[in-house]
Amino acid sequence: NVGRMLHTNSLVVWLLLGFFGAAYYLVPEESEREIHSPMLAWLQLAIFVLGTAGVVVTYLFNLFDGNFLLGNEGREFIEQPKWVKAGIVVAALIFLYNISMTVLAGKKTAITNILLLGLWVLSLLFLFAFVNPDNLALDKMYWWYIVHLWVEGTWELVMASILAFLMLKLTGVDREVVEKWLYVIAALALFSGILGTGHHYFWIGTPGYWQWIGSIFSSFEVVPFFAMMSFAFVMV
């Protein structure tokens, strides 16, 4: 269903652009330094928009069907043609370089550190989109490395950093308190999210012990979200 593909891909693009925009606003404030290169930020956006347009046209008209480089891959959420994926990687590298140089040249805080960790790991996980093995079980394992570890891992780190920044600016609460909450939320997200990937491995051909690991750690995945909600209420 092309409409569904465009809908779900639009959601991902919307969130990623939101993360990019938040980082470009948040990092200079926290680092007390201007963005390393505004020109690179515009270049990154142009590549991202061009890639998005290419995806829409490819999906709508089913262009280059079956082509290794130019055709869509038919894998949910990561259907993009390889040339678009390569463009996404280039845009991500430009973004990470720009943000990292800004942080390194300025003031380092827990907020910028956790944000950078989330953004770097998010980008590295996307590299699994280039791995498309013939074995369906292996394909699903690599697929979940992206889909699950984005939602239940890296995105939580980015969201927690943004939330901490907002609480700091809106409530005037002590930075030390905010940073303690942030570290707790980040630790919970990584602890529950990484091994919680196992709940996607139940019936795809992986060893049986993943049923136990997935079941146990999946039950903790709600904790970081609850912690973020509690953090907001306590701070306000």
Model-derived features with residue positions:
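Membrane-interfacial alpha-helical segments at the cytosolic side of multi-pass membrane proteins
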Residues: W14-P28, T154-L170
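Alpha-helical transmembrane spans of integral membrane proteins, capturing the lipid-embedded, hydrophobic core
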Residues: L45-T52, G118-L122, L149, G153, ...
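Hydrophobic, membrane-embedded alpha-helices of multi-pass small-molecule transporters
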Residues: I88, S123-A129, L149-A160, S218-V222
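Membrane-embedded translocation segments of transport machinery
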Residues: W143, V147, A160-V236
